[in-house]
Amino acid sequence: VTENLVVAAIDVGSVRNIGWWRITGSNAGGGRDLDELVDLLVADLNAGRQVALGIEAPVYVPAPVATSGLGRARVGEGNRAWCASAGTSALGFGVQETNYVLRAIARHSGRPVRGGIDVDGFLAGALDLLVWEALVTAGAKDRLAPEPHIADARVAAEEFATRVATGRVESDLEGGEVFNLAAAAIIAVGMSTETSMLRAPCVVVRPPALA
């Protein structure tokens, strides 16, 4: 990751279970306090750096046209479906905490922030802040980590950064008709007026299983 690009990820949950990781240049570090991360990201944006913010929770859901499609997993999720009990819990925390972080960034930033979900536009410099989804499955979790929530955020951020280094970040889930909750938060806090992204999926990054 270059000095002008910041990759961060948040493992959402109850306040005592939040963890985050942030990478910029050769520096990286994490923590448990969301407000600390907000302060760092505001400083990054004010310094002209781009921020790619990953949320370890479902940030969009399918938008089926028939009842037979309701409550179905997204293609590629496997046993980590958004509609399973753990997925719906993470979705709820993710919606609230994504909105909290984006609203705090918008409120404290010294300039307007161009937010969105289009990773190609972000890499081309058209966005200041990108929201992406982290899908950390059981095999990618470090069970021996002293801070497992920070460790989950770290493995997600590192995988996104690895893909950025190749110049292309592809999603590990298939697309389709969706309702994007992260996009709703981006619009709600004034980072964009582009309503078409409400119907578009974010890029989803699934770190590989640990060796």
Task: Locate the predicted segments by residue.
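RNase H-like (RuvC/DEDD) metal-dependent nuclease/polynucleotide-processing core
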Residues: 1-211
